[in-house]
Amino acid sequence: MVVSDGGKRVKLNVGGEIFETNASTIQSSCPDSLLAALSTSTSHGSNPVFIDRDPEIFAVILNLLRTGRLPANSSGVFSKQELLDEAMYYGVESLLRLAMLPPPLLGFDASLVSTIVPAADGVPSALTATAGDASLWIAHGGQISVYDWSLSHAGTVRTHLNDITSICRVWGEAAAIGSGSASGLHFYDLSGGRYIGSTHWTDPEDPRIHKARVAAVADSEGGVFASFDCLHRENSVLQIDKSTLQVAAVIGQQSGNSAKTTVPEKLRWLPAKGLLVGSAVQRGVFGCSGYIRIWDPRSRNIVWETNEPGSGRSTRFGDALADMDVDVEDSILFKVCSKSGDLGMADIRKLGEDPWVYMSDENPGAWKAGDGGGYSVVHCYRKQVLAARGGALEVWSSVKEKTSGDPIRRRNFVDKEDDSKRGMISKIEAGGDRLFVSRECMEGVEVWETSSFSGVVSVE
């Protein structure tokens, strides 16, 4: 390496090719890297230090140092792993990571970029992307495959279960998993493939509570929440101590002999309020029925609930919820109506007998009530509500009304018509500005991102 002009210009010999840049370019971008250390050295005389690495990949790395971005054609020439290996060698992995991560997810401007297919038993049964670092855990069969922030395969862990229907990251690299065919909530350390322990719901005074299976899992700082369902349909939500894996509290035990008392199939924790939200929906030839319920784990009491059909305004009777989710940041409940397709929202801070405000989109091209297929999955992510209807994927986004400036919500398709023909959407997850979608009886998980070349759009 040669440093000249008062230390401003640097020459590098990489694989026999000479590269020239400014020392400030290297030192300002990655001051603790190998390149920064070499750029401050002046003891090599007039000959640049020879670095025995691929010069073509280094050209990409140098462009990254100069601009903070990867060249547009780099993804088609080099694999992610090749770029990562070189970035780690030069000590600029953090810079490459920032460049490779997708821009903020805008559902109405997202596109399918890849499909992740596990090597064996490729049909996903559960997935989670809640870590926020763009990583993904896929449960398939009795295995869990881990994909890091670059979606590179980091490893697969074989569990003792034949199938996994619930998965949740509870701390570090530890997963809490449940099965629809085996009792108990089980904990695994995925970094080393180590079984940690299990939690079971039992009651010596009630023989009906036996071999309870897990239907849903949610994590919180104070513990893990899991809904359990027994063969006799007795069900409840357990609060589990992370340090001991022992049951800390039994919340909302019920008989499960009607749609209003079935086991919660979805759990969401609201850290700002210290509340737990659960829901269950049953679908039949006459439509949907179910409930949304909010518990305070401190008192173990229900603080609010709604049952559908059977509550709310009469004009909405028969248009029961198809699914619900929670905007954790703004403490807002969202539900999508099974017949009209309208979106209902309720401020958790102002709940009452009928707190729902309904939004419909008058755009005739966005949705028609006569279209076949009802809603099956709803997921909230960064002020956006993603809803699957059959094989189609829609998003409700918050925008400002031009005249009044008040926030309103608009519905748009995320996918194209050809995308919706690939199969019924069964699961939606989002994390790290990526959208993950799986379809019934289809191998793999679709990865959707907003293009880096899309125009900047403000989403409130």
UniProtKB/Swiss-Prot annotation:
Name the record gives this protein: Protein ENDOPLASMIC RETICULUM-ARRESTED PEN3
Gene inactivation effect: ABCG36/PEN3 retention and accumulation in the endoplasmic reticulum associated with an increased sensitivity to the root-penetrating pathogenic fungus Fusarium oxysporum.
Membrane-spanning ranges: none
SMART domains hit by this protein: BTB
Function: May act as a substrate-specific adapter of an E3 ubiquitin-protein ligase complex (CUL3-RBX1-BTB) which mediates the ubiquitination and subsequent proteasomal degradation of target proteins. Confers resistance to soil-born pathogens (e.g. the root-penetrating fungus Fusarium oxysporum) by regulating membrane trafficking, specifically mediating ABCG36/PEN3 exit from the endoplasmic reticulum and subsequent relocalization at the host-pathogen interface of the plasma membrane.
SUPFAM superfamilies in the cross-refs: POZ domain, YVTN repeat-like/Quinoprotein amine dehydrogenase
Main subcellular location: cytoplasm
GO CC terms in record: cytosol
Record CDD domains: BTB_POZ_KCTD-like
Domain notes: The BTB/POZ domain mediates the interaction with some component of ubiquitin ligase complexes.
Every BTB domain range: 8-74
Tissue specificity comment: Expressed at very low levels.
Record InterPro entries: BACURD1-3, BTB/POZ_dom, Quino_amine_DH_bsu, SKP1/BTB/POZ_sf, T1-type_BTB
Subcellular location per the Swiss-Prot or TrEMBL entry: Cytoplasm, Cytosol
Keywords per UniProt: Cytoplasm, Protein transport, Transport, Ubl conjugation pathway
GO BP annotations listed: defense response to fungus; intracellular protein transport; protein homooligomerization; protein ubiquitination
Pathway in which this enzyme or protein is active: Protein modification; protein ubiquitination
